[in-house]
Amino acid sequence: MISPYIAEFVGTTILLLLGSGIVANVSLSKTKGSKETPLITITTAWGFAVFVAAYVTGEFSGAHLNPAVTIGLVVAGKFSVDLMIGYIIAQVLGAMLGSWLTYVFYIDHYRSTSDENAVMGSFCTSPAIRNYKNNF
């Protein structure tokens, strides 16, 4: 039996590696990703990433894969407060590893991409039009 903490760590690593990896493949310079249909490619791949991560970890940890899910379940009284901190630590560390692996696998592409938004886009989201009054 695998520890639920290890399962959350591995699942979140898979989720971020596959999800961020496809965004990097589509957005960065000189990759083989399809630039013609990025929205379909990215959304389908993220859906697949969630499916794979949940399938791999669901039996062992419930496949929260996100601190917001864990906190929401605790607030709803459907998950133990005692396990929450361990789950969140495992998820954050897994997300860090998945993001780092994406960077390592695409390091040459990150270095050759001059568009800062394309580089940032594989790791986070931001408004397309920055307007602090409307964005917050």
Show the residue positions of the predicted features:
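Membrane-interface helix-loop junctions and terminal tails of multi-pass membrane proteins
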Residues: 1-136
